[in-house]
Amino acid sequence: TNKKPHIPRILMITITLNQTEMQMATLNGMGRLVQNQTNGVSSNGRRKLDPDIIGTGGEIAVARYFNRYPDLSIGPHRRGYDLEVNRTTIDVKTTTFNPGYLQAKTTKKVSDADMYILVHASFPTFTILGGVRAAEFLQDYNIKDMGYGPNYTLEQSQLHSLKSLFVK
């Protein structure tokens, strides 16, 4: 039969940044870019807007969804998360690819963040695609090489809705 595989539907949340948030993302992203260059860290991949600006925009969108202020600190921070909600630490990953992949470096540990959330960016509009708990994501069987070296990788269709991840 030509039956399509079942892909769980997740509720996607779209957030369009306002003028102030766009300026915050741009200024903060430029600051992070300079800091990363100073530290010898470079972002991989080619994108239309600087990955640091896109990443900051994704963090702002997720923070707004949870009615929190984003952490816009610039500089090397040792902690492995971007946001904390109800004692759950969250690492926000932003992509310009659609469908997107949630990816994290193989140096990540479950203790770095409790949850990973994938956001699609079409600046200034960001769509929260879903998330996954670190213990489920950071498993050897999720390590794949998509052309940039081995990373923990999940397809967008493997993610869970935020609502299901935050069920009490």
Predicted regions and their residues:
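Nucleic-acid endonuclease domains
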Residues: 1-86, 93-168
